[in-house]
Amino acid sequence: MTATVLAYGYDGKELKTLKTVCARLDIRLRRVTAEEYAQPVGVFFGLTPRVESGESADEAIPERMIVLGGLTSRQLDAFLSAMKTARAGASLKAVLTEHNERWSGPALYVELSKERAAMDGR
């Protein structure tokens, strides 16, 4: 699998910064548009077939979110460090797994939000 970062909710300056970071590290960047949110995240990595119906494409993801797939440990460390240095981090980050590759963007967002709330003790 090609090292890829999926970007949800990125535009403007943040998207430009993310593009720069990914280009420097030879990581493919794929911006996911709101119209594509209902697709399983695995679709964008070539692992899961597209869906015809399902969740509404207008379900919002109110924060920036990234999904990382196919990165080596070194690439992952370099990416996270570069994003921190550039102050362009996403509120929510996930690594693609066999468990979440079939989830839509909004479903992944809900799960990551729950995990963050549990870790924050909310």
Language model regions located:
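Mid-chain, well-packed structural core segment of small domains
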Residues: 55-86
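Short, charged/polar micro-motifs that form catalytic or ligand-binding hotspots
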Residues: 8, 65, 69-70, 94-98
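N-terminal, charge-rich interaction modules
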Residues: 1-47
